[in-house]
Curated annotation (Swiss-Prot):
Zn(2+) 2 binds at K156, H189, H245. Binds 2 Zn(2+) ions per subunit. One of its GO terms (cellular component) is cytosol. Belongs to the metallo-dependent hydrolases superfamily. Hydantoinase/dihydropyrimidinase family. This is D-hydantoinase. PANTHER family: COLLAPSIN RESPONSE MEDIATOR PROTEIN (PTHR11647:SF1), HYDRANTOINASE/DIHYDROPYRIMIDINASE FAMILY MEMBER (PTHR11647). The modification N6-carboxylysine is found at K156. It comes from Streptomyces coelicolor (strain ATCC BAA-471 / A3(2) / M145). The gene is hyuA. Its EC number is 3.5.2.-.
Length: 467
């Protein structure tokens, strides 16, 4: 039986257009759009009518970087796929791409199967997977080809975390060469982990144990050096490169230079680098531990380069790197030794709102908001135009957004499974009102109407900027 919904009277915003239009949804997909008040729009009929007058109608957010239930430092990220995808929906995100992990000594397939088992039947919204490659060998390289064919088309490597996820330059080059052949996209955590480990050891020997030292040892220059090295290795391999969680002015400069040379190099940043700084890491009484993530928060002056990069398209995507650990019992593992603080912050629920606040404050325009949060990540990870836009044939992943509502971000009211908010007390303008995932209401006028198991695994095509 056909199910139809009409969203009437809103300002439809995509990466390329803004138009006052009515949206007809049929069987989980966008069937048609027509300018509000025209005979074509008036002819839309449906059982369900959503009044979006005075509101924005935007594509559901695509968060290309989350870590649900991720093991790290002897504990696990606090959000499960159930709680994390529910929180994402509350924040206007309707698709996540999470990271399945290959453990050293194991196959990619084992890691991917484990993540499918965590997610299947538990997600409120649609999801896909990237693959973390921790152990490059001949078998792993063959498996990369198979995964691309199955719709896992991006592979993350780490220049950081020796002994855990770290790959050396030779392993990175081999994986990049394979990606150049099979169409995959290499995603890079670009920090010089070998040098950082020396600085960590030296800092602890001096008695520098507080959370703020996490930011001091993970130097911007070591992010820039690794970014430069990753770009040149990718150039040698003839492969595209996507650098995750870019935080430093010097790293943006490396990306800008590479793109000016015409290289297929892309960069992502995250809200924490745009809105927070080392001032947070330096908060007293171990409060700074809440803000320990890698790459680390930088001094405030780095924010201008990140905003500029987003405006000039030297940075193309804003994701969250959502990897929450509770302050109580998890972040506290690092009391007396900052290197033992689990690395990661909550944010999957806040991204769309914080980026709307960036529109309010004049950092970016409305269409750029949708571009960096919805359309570009969908294209980058082979999901467009099924995801990331509002157009006939697209999945009806749609958010009715109130641009005038005011809210105060707080752990008291958020839905992430973590005991603090990185943005506690921040007053912002704009709020999600209603969320549809494939036409099904997940949030209805600020009431949760979704269910675990609605979210479907979504295989991906290869990066659409390279075809």
């Amino acid at each position: 039986m056909s199910s139809r919904t009409v969203i009437r009277g809103g300002l439809v915003i995509t990466a390329s257009d803004e138009i006052h239009a009515d949206v007809l949804i049929e069987d989980g997909r966008v069937a048609a759009l027509a300018a509000t008040g025209t005979p074509a729009a008036e002819a839309f009929t449906a059982e369900n009518v959503i009044d979006a007058s005075g509101k924005y109608v935007i594509p559901g957010g695509v968060d290309g970087h989350t870590h649900m239930e991720m093991p790290f430092g002897g504990t696990y990220a606090a959000d499960t796929f159930e709680t994390g995808t529910r929180a994402a929906a509350w924040g206007g995100t309707t698709t996540i791409v999470d990271f399945a992990i290959q453990s050293v000594g194991h196959s990619l397939r084992e890691g991917l199967d484990a993540w499918h088992a965590k997610a299947e039947g538990n997600c409120a919204i649609d999801y896909g997977f990237h693959m973390i490659v921790s152990d490059v060998n001949q078998e792993t390289l063959k498996e990369m080809d198979l995964l691309v064919e199955e719709g896992v088309t991006s592979f993350k490597q780490f220049m950081a975390y020796p002994g855990v996820f770290y790959s050396d330059d030779g392993q990175i080059l081999r994986a990049m060469q394979r990606a150049a052949e099979n169409g995959g996209l290499i995603m890079m955590h670009a920090e010089n982990g070998i040098a950082i480990d020396v600085l960590v050891e030296q800092a602890l020997a001096r008695g520098e144990t507080d959370p703020r030292f996490h930011g001091e040892v993970r130097k911007a220059l070591l992010e820039a050096e690794a970014t430069h090295r990753a770009i040149r290795l990718a150039q040698v391999a003839g492969a595209p490169l996507y650098v995750v969680h870019v935080s430093a002015t010097e790293a943006v400069a490396e990306l800008t230079r590479a793109r000016d040379e015409g290289l297929p190099v892309f960069g992502e940043t995250c809200p924490q680098y745009l809105f927070l700084s080392t001032d947070n890491l330096a908060e007293p009484d171990f409060e700074g531990a809440k803000y320990v993530c890698s790459t680390p928060l930088r001094p405030k002056e780095h924010q201008a380069a990140l905003w500029r990069g987003l405006r000039t398209n030297d940075l193309q995507v804003v994701s969250t790197d959502h990897c929450p650990f509770c302050f109580s019992g998890q972040k506290e593992l690092g009391r007396g030794d900052f290197s033992r603080i689990p690395n990661g912050m909550p944010g999957v629920e806040n991204r769309m709102d914080l980026l709307h606040q960036a529109v309010v404050e004049g950092h970016i325009g409305r269409r750029r908001w949708i571009e960096i949060a919805c359309a570009t990540p969908a294209r980058m990870f082979g999901l467009y135009p099924k995801k990331g836009t509002i157009a006939p044939g697209a999945d009806a992943d749609i958010v009715v957004y109130d641009p005038h509502a005011e809210q105060v971000i707080s752990a008291e009211t958020h839905h992430m499974n973590v005991d603090y908010s990185a943005y506690e007390g921040r007053r912002i303008t704009g709020r999600v009102e209603t969320v549809l995932s494939r036409g099904e209401p997940v949030v209805t006028e600020r009431e949760y109407t979704g269910r675990k198991g609605h979210g479907a695994y979504t295989p991906r095509a290869t990066c659409q900027y390279l075809t």
